[in-house]
């Protein structure tokens, strides 16, 4: 013991060990403890220290990470860092954290996942990593290879006075639905926030500031850089043609909201209904339901003010399903949510296989705007309305071509069918109508009468009455005609008709017919 104490005091400060482990006091203490117990290994520890110093000099720009010890910090914090190191199992932490030329970096970015802190966002040029670097220690905290990114979302942050955007990076096996292969750790999603405005600290790899042009915002710059580096996906943003909330942003008046507030258990979050799937965020665990992973969607606990949304999800490589319930959704958003679900056929479990086979994806050659313009719902609805209007116009043209005012009365060659002409001819004896026509009253919105069977030569007056408030005119017209029939049963026949294929409550055609 005395010999060990003498040797320990003699080797308390070895220059090589002091230089090599100056930044690691706990590791340096363990080395000296080992030397005190086994002083014969002093030359070995000196050689290790010298080699470590040479590595530090060689990789001066890449900081050495602390060795994990029981005194370094809470176990939960270590797990967070380990899970966030990389999303791909093919890359080691050394690949992610190695010194590499940068294509883009942006300082003072507020990250929410997997760590809540301000970091520098980096995109490497050669290896293609998206990573976050500590601005004080210069250590890479976490990151992911761009080839392992499955979904990228850019979403407005709800309920903020200042407009901000959250970028959500969802790696493979990191969507909360699909589990990684056995023995591998599930990667965590990355979420960071940028303000709506010009970027203050965005630079290219050579240090040139980016976004100095007029109209360039931080959101535009980051989205552009991501799209340039992503090969399997593109940045997806909300689209009002997919879903927009019935309630505007509470903190930013006049701005549309694309989210729905909901609870998963006791955890509050927001649902976003996007062109590639449904996101629930922005707290852990973030969940993204891609269309191909949705088995079916249903409603439960539908009350006067709220409802619950149940999503049955099926992983891509498994037949086992899991059901997640999102509660306390405002009833005001039911119509928009239901239209979105029906548009993509998400309410029908029998279509799940077709969705998986089709694998909904706007991330090909088309941009998000182009993909939204090609969506079936709005375009199809517009074309149907145009088609109905065209058919009405065609039928009106046919009636005008067939109409011959002189065929009823050879003495009347004016060719007029106006109300004024009908008044002038009212005193004359009229020939009975020979068309074999069946006339009657059709209330607005009821089943169409066979308008084409009404002979145009018997029509005095034809007009169109829009739906809505004008339908009251149809009922008033009915009453007047019934009164006239009571006074003079031989005066007129009448009909309210709509063209076949015309949407009900859209157009009502009114005809006053000669007997």
Curated annotation (Swiss-Prot):
Residues 371-383, 392-411, 418-432 have a biased composition (Acidic residues). InterPro entries: PH-like_dom_sf, RTT106/SPT16-like_middle_dom, RTT106/SSRP1_HistChap/FACT. Pfam families: Rttp106-like_middle (PF08512). Residues 83-92 have a biased composition (Polar residues). Keywords: Chaperone, Chromosome, DNA-binding, Nucleus, Transcription, Transcription regulation. One of its GO terms (molecular function) is DNA binding. GO terms for cellular component: chromosome; nucleus. Residues 62-95, 362-439 are annotated as: Disordered. It is found in: Nucleus; Chromosome. Interacts with histones H3 and H4. Histones H3 and H4 chaperone involved in the nucleosome formation and heterochromatin silencing. Required for the deposition of H3K56ac-carrying H3-H4 complex onto newly-replicated DNA. Plays a role in the transcriptional regulation of the cell-cycle dependent histone genes by creating a repressive structure at the core histone gene promoter. PANTHER family: FACT COMPLEX SUBUNIT SSRP1, HISTONE CHAPERONE RTT106. Belongs to the RTT106 family. This is Histone chaperone rtt106. It comes from Aspergillus oryzae (strain ATCC 42149 / RIB 40).
């Amino acid at each position: 013991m005395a010999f060990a104490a003498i040797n320990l005091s003699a080797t308390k400060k070895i220059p090589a060990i002091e230089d090599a482990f100056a930044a690691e006091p706990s590791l340096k203490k363990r080395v000296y403890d080992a030397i005190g117990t086994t002083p014969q290994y002093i030359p070995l520890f000196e050689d290790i220290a010298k080699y470590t110093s040479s590595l530090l000099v060689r990789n001066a720009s890449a900081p050495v990470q602390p060795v994990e010890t029981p005194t370094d910090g809470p176990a939960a914090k270590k797990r967070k860092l380990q899970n966030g190191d990389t999303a791909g199992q093919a890359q080691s932490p050394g690949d992610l954290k190695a010194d590499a030329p940068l294509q883009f970096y942006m300082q003072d970015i507020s990250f929410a996942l997997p760590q809540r802190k301000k970091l520098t966002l980096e995109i490497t040029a050669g290896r293609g990593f998206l990573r976050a670097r500590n601005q004080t220690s210069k250590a890479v905290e976490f990151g992911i290879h761009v080839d392992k990114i499955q979904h990228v979302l850019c979403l407005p942050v709800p309920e903020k006075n200042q407009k901000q955007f959250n970028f959500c990076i969802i790696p493979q096996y990191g969507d909360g639905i699909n589990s990684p292969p056995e023995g591998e750790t599930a990667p965590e999603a990355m979420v960071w926030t940028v303000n709506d405005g010009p970027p203050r600290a965005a630079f290219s790899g050579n240090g040139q500031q980016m976004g100095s042009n007029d109209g360039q915002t931080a959101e535009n710059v980051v989205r552009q850089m991501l799209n340039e580096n992503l090969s399997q996906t593109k940045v997806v943003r909300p689209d009002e043609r997919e879903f927009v909330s019935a309630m505007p942003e509470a903190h930013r008046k006049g701005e549309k909201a694309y989210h729905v507030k909901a609870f998963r258990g006791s955890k509050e979050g927001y649902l976003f209904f996007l062109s590639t799937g449904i996101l629930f965020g922005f707290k852990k665990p973030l969940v993204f339901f891609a269309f191909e992973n949705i088995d079916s969607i249903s409603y439960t606990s539908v009350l006067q003010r709220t409802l619950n949304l149940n999503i049955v999800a099926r992983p891509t490589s498994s037949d086992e399903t899991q059901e997640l319930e999102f509660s306390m959704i405002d009833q005001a958003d039911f119509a928009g949510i239901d239209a979105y679900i029906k548009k993509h056929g998400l309410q029908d479990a029998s279509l799940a296989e077709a969705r998986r086979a089709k694998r909904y994806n706007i991330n090909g050659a088309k941009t998000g705007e182009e993909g939204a313009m090609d969506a079936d719902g709005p375009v199809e609805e517009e074309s149907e309305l145009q088609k109905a209007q065209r058919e009405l116009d065609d039928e009106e043209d046919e009636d005008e071509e067939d109409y011959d005012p002189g065929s009823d009365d050879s003495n009347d060659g004016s060719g007029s069918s106006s109300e004024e002409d009908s008044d002038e001819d009212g005193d004359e004896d009229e020939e009975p109508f020979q068309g074999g026509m069946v006339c009657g009253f059709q209330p607005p919105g009821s089943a169409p009468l066979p308008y084409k069977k009404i002979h145009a030569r018997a029509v005095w007056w034809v007009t169109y009455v829009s739906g809505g408030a004008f339908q009251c005119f149809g009922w008033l017209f009915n009453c007047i005609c019934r009164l006239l029939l009571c006074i003079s049963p031989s005066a007129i026949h009448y009909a309210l008709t709509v063209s076949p294929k015309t949407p009900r409550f859209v157009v009502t055609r009114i005809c006053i017919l000669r007997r």
